[in-house]
Amino acid sequence: MPTPKAFTLLGPTACGKTALALKIAETLPVEIISLDSALLYTGMDIGTAKPSASERAFVPHHLIDIITPVQTYSAARFVEDCTRLTGEITARGKCPLIVGGTMMYFRALTQGLNDLPEADACLRADLDEQKQMYGLDFLYRTLQKVDPETACRLKPNDSQRIGRALEVYYLTGRPMSAHLNGQPEHTLPFELYTAALIPENRARLHENIALRFHLMLEQGFIGEVENLRRRYPGLTADSPAIRCVGYRQAWEHLDGATDRQTFIEKGIAATRQLAKRQLTWLRKTPLDCVADPFSDGTSGTRLIEAAKRFFGE
């Protein structure tokens, strides 16, 4: 049996990945595998710019709406799901098209996973108690002592990742940085072609981000977050689902911490920061083909042709 093939379309938020993926679907018999951690959650449609019902009816989409906002998902599970789906889609005679910008998942898929321990509920409860008693700054200073490399790359207010780094250290006796630096060799079980939309005009990308954020507000984004708060009482601003850009800022606004204008400004700024991080990842990623989505209108055609050649169509 021939080795399965998958075509990956990467790019920062608001650069036109979904629109291009649908154009590819007009040309090739594809099924889309979402590479977007925000699209996993049910009930989070507007703020994630989730593909519409008609778009999902036009071409099959996978790894969308598979967990609730109070459930968790991991890079390890993505690798497992993506690998399985690639084989299943290929067996159906279709072409797997991986689309998104969650670069941590892509790195896990292409470079492999580190042997980090599973979360430990008892240890995490102990760390949460320490945070309540002594403050997050105490945990951050502890991390600086036991794993200065990880502490250096984390923000002092990143409660979730600080807790996870300490958890790894206490469970294994080794700092997380040592685990990450000791990454084993990894071989993909399928052939992968990696294309990316990378805009040279950063101002145009920022304009798209602002326009899309305002459109989300018109579509009822605040109401969507209010519904999440009512439906899932266990959700907090630190929940992984609410850490998605826009949602945390909306959550703070609904808590009364910001007025509407400040919320909008912070939401747009957070989305721009996400795009910046995605572009930084992309510039370090080996790519088979790169196109500027805001250039002359031919970039989409080039990537469609690249996909056709790759799949032998």
UniProtKB/Swiss-Prot annotation:
One of its GO terms (biological process) is tRNA modification. InterPro entries: Dimethylallyltransferase, IPT, P-loop_NTPase. The keyword Kinase does not apply. It is an enzyme of class 2 (transferase). Its EC number is 2.5.1.75. ATP binds at residues 11-18. Residues 36-39, 160-164, 243-248 are annotated as: Interaction with substrate tRNA. Its cofactor is Mg(2+). PANTHER family: TRNA DIMETHYLALLYLTRANSFERASE. Catalyzes the transfer of a dimethylallyl group onto the adenine at position 37 in tRNAs that read codons beginning with uridine, leading to the formation of N6-(dimethylallyl)adenosine (i(6)A). This is tRNA dimethylallyltransferase.
